[in-house]
Amino acid sequence: GIVFKEPEIDLSKMKEWKNNIIGGLTGGLSGLAKQRGVDVIHGTAKFSSKNEIEVNHESDSRRISSDQFIIAVGSEPAELSFLPDDPRIIDSTGALEPDQIPSDILIIGGGIIGLEMATIYSALGSEVTIVELTKQLMPETDPDLVRPLERILNKKCKKIMKSSQVISAIASDEGISVSFKKDDEEFSEIFQNVL
């Protein structure tokens, strides 16, 4: 007979796969820009006129003139001042480099990135709770588009709390104790990780 073992997730192979995908996408965009004759310049820029920008990068500063500019600003994870400094509190960058899969995770924010992370961690086996300040997930999106996604997430996630606010978080040996406020009610829960 044949005996199959319980499937396991190899986090190091998963990270390697993710890094290969990111490297391919980044390299592909750089190659496409070069192929189209686009000069890619890194730094902090500001327009000095409609056809000129001043770019600062490290100790270098220069002015560039052009009829057209493509501004690719990228993004940085938001830092929430009420969260304690604790390695179990991660941002979206750290969430893609896990050392272990948490048994449960609170995701603060029901925007696109938060929902991507909820889907990933749910698929990895974590119990996922999402908290969103507004009455709708992905608040800037047409509600008719959000409803089908929310139905799927309700099946995959432990809990989705909308119109709810995180008011504090305290790190302890047990986990991260997070206090919430919904309407006039306050309550707390403990999570292994918070994103």
Where are these regions (language model features)?
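Rossmann-like dinucleotide-binding cores of NAD(P)H-dependent redox enzymes
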Residues: 16, 20-30, 96-97, 102-106, ...
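Glycine-centered loop/turn motif at secondary-structure junctions
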Residues: 1, 35-37, 125, 156-157
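Short polybasic/polar patches that bind polyanions
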Residues: 5, 34, 71, 122, ...
